[in-house]
């Protein structure tokens, strides 16, 4: 019950999905257990025309998610990635460096429910207009695993807030 409440509080701060289109879908890595779900959500959004491109961010995860997207029928020319980032802040900064020069501003951001609030605020800080889109946790995810994610996000939000990583920047990375 405590984990569910903690997660509901994090998700309750998010704007609902408006169904609007975006310039790109941005998929954040977050470990091997969450790759398949994120790839499936990104492929679904792309196939329904929500955005013309998919960008994957994350050192360990992006190569695997890119393969899953290709295997799921997304042509390579609509895919791009960076595999240097190791934190949410680096995800946002490196994504901004690569996408904003291409005039990509409005993004559909894909991550898990617990991570979304910090990711949304961090990407907004880098100048993106963000449409949050949640990827579900795998069914086999246990309550203790989910509790770790939720606790980690509360600590991450506190850390980013105290370090000034959630306040608006002037523009870009």
What are these regions (language model features)?
Residues 158:
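Acidic, metal-coordinating catalytic segment for phosphate/diphosphate chemistry
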Residues 166-173:
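The feature marks non-catalytic terminal segments
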């Amino acid at each position: 019950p405590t984990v569910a409440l903690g997660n509901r509080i994090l998700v309750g701060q998010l704007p609902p999905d408006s169904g609007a289109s975006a310039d790109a879908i941005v998929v954040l890595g977050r470990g091997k257990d969450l790759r398949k779900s994120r790839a499936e959500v990104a492929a679904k959004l792309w196939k329904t025309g929500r955005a013309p491109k998919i960008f994957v961010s994350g050192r360990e995860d992006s190569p695997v998610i890119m393969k899953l997207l290709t295997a799921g029928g997304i042509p390579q020319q609509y895919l791009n990635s960076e595999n240097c980032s190791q934190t949410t802040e680096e995800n946002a900064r490196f994504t901004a460096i690569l996408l904003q020069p291409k005039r990509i501003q409005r993004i559909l951001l894909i991550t898990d429910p617990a991570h979304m609030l910090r990711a949304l605020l961090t990407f907004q800080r880098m100048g993106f207009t963000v449409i949050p889109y949640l990827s579900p946790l795998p069914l086999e995810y246990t309550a203790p695993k989910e509790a770790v994610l939720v606790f980690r996000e509360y600590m991450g939000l506190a850390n980013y807030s105290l370090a000034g990583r959630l306040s608006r920047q002037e523009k870009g990375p």
